Structures are given as structure tokens and as C-alpha cells.
A protein has these predicted regions:
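Alpha-helical transmembrane segments and their helix-helix packing motifs
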Residues: 1-273
């Protein structure tokens, strides 16, 4: 059905302008198709896998057989779904297929790739994208998702924060770290400041700084990307969740996404992508 949940899915993927330009209904069938199988949406899963496969072919000799097969198999799996999504069950199957494929790719790269530039660039791209995704998901939930008629801390609010944790595979981690019911400020603390949480913003920045350091050491020079990543990490390390809520979590997340985009552009320019 239609509703804020599907609008939030579009916004968290940062494709709301593209979706609205197509004049499609904001419902499960159309949003699900747009985000997964739409060949005209450059951010759809289908298009992302096509790009990944094309890029993989271009650097095929630097990928292990296992890493290449993980990418190629994922592309073939999605192709089998065709171009339409007949029902909710199919949408769930697509999502599960992609999650399995991503885990397979991560595992193959981690276990088989040489620790040199190819691997570091793979991890760096993942890290920048992960930080962007975490920040956008947090902002959508905090700033947009709860209807004005619903109370903060009510059953719907609790359900939505729990769903967010499930979305980023962090519900078990949350319970392990905080050992209490789901609270918005603790979810934000986990996904922003907890260094042990792999997809937290600070963990992503630490990874980015380390990976850029490895590339700098191997290539003999540092550049703007190293400075941007280090400055962003330093600023976040000197803050805390209380400060962010007082100054405005939404404003912080918008600024973080912008700075993260600047980092991505600096990496592309520094290494001539």
C-alpha cells in the first residue's frame, strides 16, 4: 500500500527526484520495482549490478576467480527475475537474493583478494557507500517517517526504530550493547559513535582513513581525500550523542552526507576515476 514507509525507502536511497519525475504511484509495487528491477533508474539493483559486472570485467585480471564469480552470479540471479514484480513475495525473494549475493561477494573478496590496491579500493568504495546509507536511513527515520499524529515513543515509533535496526542488521548488536528497550538516542549512538559497530559513521570514517593511508603508502603520496577523511573523523571523535541532539541531529546528518559526498569526489579525483 501507499504511505510514509515507501516514501522513506525512496528518500533513503536518495532517488526521490527521479521517482517523482516518473509520475509513479508511491506504493509497494512501484517503489519496489523502481528500486530493484527498473532498467532506467541508475540506482536500481539491476543497474548497480550491471555496472559492477562491467567494472569487474574491466579489471578482471586483478580479481580472483571467486570474487569475479560472486559478481557475475549475482547479476545472473537478478536477471532471472525478469523486469516485473508480480507480488510481495517476489520482492522479498529479490531482497533476500541480493543480501545473500552481497555476503558472498564480501566473503570472497575478504578471503581471496591480495591486500593491495584492488582490495583497498573495493573496501573504500564499500565504506563510503555504507556511511552514506547509514546516515540517510537515520535521517529518514528521525526527520520524516513518524506521522505527526503519532507520539514519539509510542508503539509505531518503537516499531520503526526496531525496523531500522533490523534493516542494518544491528538489532542483536543493540541489545548486546545497551541491554534495554529500543530508544531513539541509543540507536543513534550505536549507528554514529560506536566504533565496534561496523556500519557506524565513526567506524566507516576510521576504515576510510586507514584504507586511504594504505593507498598513500603504496603510491607514495597523500592528497585531499586523506585530509577530508582525517578531518571528518577528528570532528566526529570530538563529539557525542548529547551534543548532536542539542545542536540538531537532522542538521548533523545532512552535513555528514554532504561531507561524505565530498570525500567520494575527492577520492575519484585523487585516483583519476
Amino acid at each position: 500500500g501507499a504511505g510514509p514507509a515507501w516514501e522513506s525507502a525512496i528518500r533513503s536511497a536518495a532517488v526521490d527526484d527521479g521517482f517523482l519525475a516518473r509520475n509513479l504511484p508511491m506504493d509497494e509495487a512501484h517503489v519496489g520495482w523502481f528500486l530493484t528491477l527498473d532498467p532506467e533508474n541508475p540506482s536500481s539493483i539491476r543497474r548497480c549490478l550491471e555496472c559492477a559486472r562491467s567494472n569487474g570485467r574491466a579489471v578482471r585480471t586483478s580479481l580472483t576467480l571467486e570474487t569475479w564469480e560472486a559478481v557475475n552470479d549475482a547479476w545472473h540471479e537478478v536477471q532471472r527475475f525478469g523486469t516485473t514484480i508480480p507480488d510481495s513475495t517476489t520482492l522479498v525473494r529479490i531482497a533476500d537474493t541480493i543480501k545473500d549475493a552481497l555476503l558472498m561477494f564480501d566473503g570472497a573478496a575478504h578471503r581471496t583478494q591480495l591486500r593491495e590496491a584492488t582490495y583497498w579500493f573495493l573496501r573504500l568504495g564499500t565504506t563510503v557507500e555504507r556511511a552514506d546509507n547509514t546516515a540517510r536511513l537515520l535521517d529518514v527515520k528521525y526527520h520524516l517517517l513518524l506521522p505527526r499524529t503519532e507520539p514519539v515513543g509510542g508503539s509505531l515509533d518503537y516499531f520503526q526504530w526496531t525496523t531500522l535496526l533490523r534493516t542494518v542488521s544491528a538489532l542483536t548488536a543493540y541489545r548486546w550493547v545497551y541491554r534495554e528497550s529500543v530508544k531513539p538516542w541509543l540507536v543513534a549512538d550505536l549507528l554514529i559513535f560506536n566504533r565496534a559497530m561496523p556500519r557506524s559513521l565513526i567506524a566507516c570514517l576510521e576504515d576510510a582513513v586507514w584504507l586511504l593511508d594504505q593507498l598513500a603508502a603504496s603510491r607514495g603520496r597523500r592528497g585531499p581525500a586523506n585530509r577530508i577523511a582525517a578531518n571528518s573523523l577528528r570532528a566526529l571523535a570530538n563529539s557525542n550523542i548529547d551534543t548532536l541532539f542539542q545542536s540538531g541531529l537532522h542538521e548533523f546528518l545532512v552535513e555528514f552526507v554532504g561531507e561524505n559526498n565530498r570525500l567520494g569526489n575527492a577520492i575519484a579525483e585523487q585516483y583519476l576515476f
